Amino acid sequence: MKFENLLIEIGTEELPPKALRTLAESFQANFSEELTKAELPFESIEWYAAPRRLALYVKGLATAQEDKVVEKRGPAVQSAFDADGNPTKAAEGWARGNGITVAEAERLATDKGEWLVYRANVAGEPTSVLVPAMTQRALDKLPIPKPMRWGSNSTQFIRPVHTVTLLLGSELIAGEVLGIQSDRTIRGHRFMGESSFSLDHADNYLAALKERGKVIADYQARKALIKADAEKAAAVIGGNADIEESLLEEVASLVEWPVVLTAHFEEKFLAVPAEALVYTMKGDQKYFPVFSNDGKLLPNFIFVANIESKDPAQIIAGNEKVVRPRLADAEFFFNTDKKHTLASRLASLETVVFQKQLGTLKDRAERISALAGFIAGQIGASSEDAARAGLLSKCDLMTNMVMEFTDTQGTMGMHYARLDGEAEAVAVALEEQYKPKFSGDSVPSAGVSCAVALAEKLDTLSGIFGIGQAPKGAADPFALRRAAIGVLRIIVENKLPLDLVDLIAKAVELHGSNLSNALAADEVLEFLMGRFRAWYQDKGISTDVILAVLARRPTRPADFDDRILAVSHFRTLEQAAALAAANKRVSNILAKVEGELPSSINDALLSEAAEKALAAKLAEVTPVIAPLFAAGNYQQALTELAALRESVDQFFEDVMVMADDQALRNNRLALLGNLRDQFLHVADISLLQ
């Protein structure tokens, strides 16, 4: 078998930058699947992507499929011939369909009888014949929500396609993909290098495109180059570039030949809160802000040009000119907003409807205020500060700055609160009310901030469930799943002594008569319990551990977490599997008992040595684990219970639980019930696999 390297390049108009990486990775996965289906072995497959191209490089690809013998089984010999030994119509039809006569068919003996069989030698197809159709199928399966047409044909793709190159080593694979006939043409940079050139070999793709076309097609290399050059540029001016991963990926998807440059803006703009300036630079202009070593924003930014200019100063000046009006707008909004206190904007919240059935933003702020004060009282934080922060929590939505730069909500509330002389805890809580904003984001840690962040999310959950708008399927327009995870994370990560039942009840109560769903509290609790499972699964916790804890329905998230950790640890113990199996056996036995289960153990009725030993061991360990349960030290309690394994095993080996003597039977059931109850203080261990 021969092997060669394959290059596939699809040359397009500018591709959507935020989708570029996903498109390339999907193309790679889809084509890899095609190769596997076609039984074409290969060594590796790499993807390349730039604004005007998607490419794959398959290393060590077989140049043809292997020849193989195809076995096609026909009817059973018994039904293939009649009583006179003549072929039946079924046998003749099968043979005709395979291009043979019944007499030419072979016979296959199996343990289920003898069958007619046709074995054919099928020659493998050359890879060059298969690649065009495989490429088309791989492209057809790309995640393209809105494909477009171009020209006069009916072909659809995410952007118009101009070139298709298929090279197997130095051989051009002839074929049509996306309505374009393949050739050797590779298009270079729009403004530098050769506008197009002919590629002689698949292995020369990256080098030729870089040297002749002035395009770095390797996405990862381009991204790494931008990051390294931006860090160097920031270091030159004594700072550190703020290189957010998502922005770096977007910038790498916008340029083919990255040139990193440093620009400057007037220092007067530094009087504006840094977050607003950073939002403008990152969100609108795709610039990297620069911070000093002590975390202060510097009057500089780093940007990436898509051209190597003879006069970079002109490009720098152009970018400085573009960003200046945006920074001036931020300065104007900030200075205008400062003329009014946050508290003075409370009345204007009455003009904005939060949700038709749930009232205005002012109604929402008042509910958050009351709920935050309630929560703060339970966690030892200032109820007064929490209530104040809750009341002001939505006031910055009415400021010019937040209306223009929406992502600064909360953050601008903090800055304006400080200018108004509000307590620092109040100001910080205004910023942290929306945390965590995304997976991996930090949670608030200060008591007042926790109270307000929890209140903000619980008000949303209780309200939306209360009007019957719970998430359905993948749809979640109110981001309730994120809110639920936020509630759980804040409580668990801060070890707050809060019970979900109490919090939800208070949140529902504060909505008053607005809620039409009488089951809102129960549904919110079930929803949060369901998010527990999703959250722990994302953290790599085994599903059976989660289900074991969920079976006990602990409604204090911090307590729930302690149980998860304890059961996860217990699962690693040598005795765990045997005790889980024993618990399952006990559970099945007790489930079959009709009527009320006996609860007290009569030592006088313990007749077998094994049941006496188990009862004694249980009596010995119970006073040890009782205070551990009370203190929530579940891990140590389960470790102590693990010592029962030997006694439990011996009990089931020697003792007949369902004895004919009812008194003996009830006493043994009481012993097993007592044993199971000890484990149930933590979780249903019988659910462990």
UniProtKB/Swiss-Prot annotation:
SMART domains: DALR_1 (SM00836)
Predominant localisation class: cytoplasm
Keyword set includes Cytoplasm: yes
Reactions catalysed, as given in the entry: tRNA(Gly) + glycine + ATP = glycyl-tRNA(Gly) + AMP + diphosphate
GO terms under cellular component: cytosol
Gene3D superfamilies with a match to the protein in the record: Isoleucyl-tRNA Synthetase, Domain 1
Superkingdom assignment: Bacteria
Keyword entries, A-Z: Aminoacyl-tRNA synthetase, ATP-binding, Cytoplasm, Ligase, Nucleotide-binding, Protein biosynthesis
A GO BP entry: arginyl-tRNA aminoacylation
Compartments (UniProt record): Cytoplasm
Single GO molecular function: arginine-tRNA ligase activity
EC number(s) given by UniProt: 6.1.1.14
Similarity remark: Belongs to the class-II aminoacyl-tRNA synthetase family.
Quaternary state and interactors: Tetramer of two alpha and two beta subunits.
Name of the protein this chain belongs to: Glycine--tRNA ligase beta subunit
